[in-house]
Each structure stands twice: as structure tokens, then as C-alpha cells.
Amino acid sequence: MKFLSARDFQPVAFLGLMLLTATAFPTSQVRRGDFTEDTTHNRPVYTTSQVGGLITYVLREILEMRKELCNGNSDCMNSDDALSENNLKLPEIQRNDGCFQTGYNQEICLLKICSGLLEFRFYLEFVKNNLQDNKKDKARVIQSNTETLVHIFKQEIKDSYKIVLPTPTSNALLMEKLESQKEWLRTKTIQLILKALEEFLKVTMRSTRQT
């Protein structure tokens, strides 16, 4: 990955990444091609291993929140009821997005990852707004570190103008629809959003190992 400086990150997200840096693999164990050196600035480097560590950290936070919301009930965690109730089309990485071993294309894959994570930004805001106060901090951590991942991956995209950005109008209409749900359905929707983000990040992590 490219060199990134401390000022590029939100405080919480940067702290998480710095903690990962302390336990990252030694440079001698990093594969050739894991990052591009920028000799014009004396900035810290974040390798594929470290980015994978950040994704793992976010996945752990998501799983913990899902377990809390479902009280550890496996049926609750695996339910997709809210998907059919709302006709939600949450971001997902498909075979033709260039992120899988067969047909891998780094540029196309990174565009999909960034576009998808930016779309999740809206859904994570809904999640945070509808959680109890004692769970909002964890939601903010997930939000902040997801933003960090967007920033990191965006630096690797040649044509960043091709990133698909959600429109404010469509977001506003969808937010109104989601907020109008009954409380029990809002809770299921939160669970579904977290589950979808979890799967999205798992595919993202596997794709980072392709390079």
C-alpha cells in the first residue's frame, strides 16, 4: 500500500491503525509489491498485512455488535426477514466486480470496494441513530474505521472519478422509509446491514491478498 500520514485519518480510526502497525509483520516478511514506496516524504507505510489487520478489527467489532443485538441467538443472526420486508439492495461484491481469483482486476475491484463502502456510510448512520446510547460508540468505531478503509483504497485507484457516489436525494428518501419502520423491523434492518457489511469486508480482505 502507499505511504499515508497521520493527518489522513480520523482520530479513532488512526489509533486503531497505529495499534495494528505495532503488531504488523516485519518488513522482511512483507511480499514484494505489497506497497509502493514514496521517497519524497518520510511517512509511515501501511502494508497489505496491516490493512488486512484493520479489516479484521472492524469485522470483530461488527460480529460483537451483532451478537449483542441478538443476545447470541443464531436464528436471529442468520435471519434475512428484513431484506424481503424492505426490498433492501445492500452493497455486495459480485463475480463480475473483479475481486475474485478468477477474473481478478485490481482497478475494477477497488472501484467496487470504495463505491460499496461509501454506500454503507449511509446505512451505518441509520444503524448508529437507532441504537441505544450504550452501543453508539461501537457504531462510531465501525463508521470511522470504514472511512479509513475507503481512504486507503482510494489512494490505489487510478481513475478515482469513476467511484460511484450515492445521491443525497435517494438517501433521504430511503432514510425516511427506514425510519418509518416499526421498532422490531428497524432492529432487524440493523442486523441485516451489519451482516451485509461483514460479508462485504470478508470479500474485500480476500481480494487484497490477490496482489
UniProtKB/Swiss-Prot annotation:
Pfam families annotated for this entry? IL6 (PF00489)
Keywords for the protein's UniProt record, in alphabetical order: Acute phase, Cytokine, Disulfide bond, Growth factor, Phosphoprotein, Secreted, Signal
On whether NAD is a keyword of this UniProt record, the answer is no
Could you tell me what induces this protein? In pancreatic islets, secretion is stimulated by IL1B. In islets from Zucker diabetic fatty (ZDF) rats, but not lean animals, secretion is also increased by endocannabinoid anandamide/AEA.
Q: A GO BP term, please?
A: positive regulation of interleukin-1 beta production
In its keyword annotation, does this UniProt entry include Secreted? Answer: yes
| S-S bridge residues | 70-76, 99-109
Q: Which GO terms describe its cellular component?
A: external side of plasma membrane; extracellular space; interleukin-6 receptor complex
* Domain of life where this protein originates: Eukaryota
- PTM-bearing positions, type Phosphoserine: 79
Per UniProt, subcellular location reads as: Secreted
Q: Tell me which positions the record assigns to the signal sequence.
A: 1-24
MF annotations from Gene Ontology: cytokine activity; growth factor activity; identical protein binding; interleukin-6 receptor binding; signaling receptor binding
What InterPro entries has UniProt attached to this entry?
Answer: 4_helix_cytokine-like_core (IPR009079), IL-6-like (IPR003574), IL-6/GCSF/MGF (IPR030474), IL6/GCSF/MGF_CS (IPR030473)
Instruction: Share what the entry says about its subunit structure, partners included.
Output: Component of a hexamer of two molecules each of IL6, IL6R and IL6ST; first binds to IL6R to associate with the signaling subunit IL6ST. Interacts with IL6R (via the N-terminal ectodomain); this interaction may be affected by IL6R-binding with SORL1, hence decreasing IL6 cis signaling. Interacts with SORL1 (via the N-terminal ectodomain); this interaction leads to IL6 internalization and lysosomal degradation. May form a trimeric complex with the soluble SORL1 ectodomain and soluble IL6R receptor; this interaction might stabilize circulating IL6, hence promoting IL6 trans signaling.
What function does this protein fulfil? Cytokine with a wide variety of biological functions in immunity, tissue regeneration, and metabolism. Binds to IL6R, then the complex associates to the signaling subunit IL6ST/gp130 to trigger the intracellular IL6-signaling pathway. The interaction with the membrane-bound IL6R and IL6ST stimulates 'classic signaling', whereas the binding of IL6 and soluble IL6R to IL6ST stimulates 'trans-signaling'. Alternatively, 'cluster signaling' occurs when membrane-bound IL6:IL6R complexes on transmitter cells activate IL6ST receptors on neighboring receiver cells.
The entry sums up its family as follows: Belongs to the IL-6 superfamily.
PANTHER family (UniProt xref): INTERLEUKIN-6 (PTHR48494:SF1)
What protein am I looking at? Interleukin-6
